[in-house]
Amino acid sequence: MIKAITLIKRKSGITVQEFQEYWRHEHVKAIARLPGIRRYVQNHPLPENYVIGMPVCDGVAELWGEDTRTFKDMASSEAYQRVQADEEQFIDRKSTQLILTSETVLNAGSPQPGGIKFLEFLQRRGGLAVEDFQHYWLAMHGPLVSKLALLRRYVQSPARPGGYSADYSPAFDALSSMWFDTREDLRQTMESGPYAAIIADRINFLRNEDISNLICEEQVIIG
């Protein structure tokens, strides 16, 4: 199974509310017609993401397909052409960032209705090979995160090896997804001793300790 993660920004002149409403209620009609979709999820940043400036993006889409052939067929379909045409209504397509990933579930709890999803966009430390980054994140760092007391669910989504070449790397190397029941649970977690240890461990495999993140409302559209 492959998961395509897309970071999208709203078109100039469109408010956050207008963007989210169109994406949530109108754009999904075009997405639903794509061939081969196994699952489709929208992540809508909550208002607090905009308090101190512009977040890394205005939305994160996650779309699952069986294999690379599925995505190739999807990209060549008439339905995908309609998706692209509809994106012009509300998305700044020049700023769109796409990464193909494989996901690993480290904490398989079920998200609660009304809960929040905390996304972190990870970039590996300079000089660290992709395979070494992914191994450390999964085998060493992941267990620290998965044991957090108030964590409901935890998923790692590293970029697939085929997304790298001698002269190209994706915009980010991985997406970390953590679910909590409430904002207060997230706040308490970030102020805890175990989370301080997680922050301290980042120097071993991440480029920056201060990484881009979003606090989101997750909306499962398909699957």
Go through each PLM region and give its residues.
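Macromolecular interaction modules
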Residues: 1-223
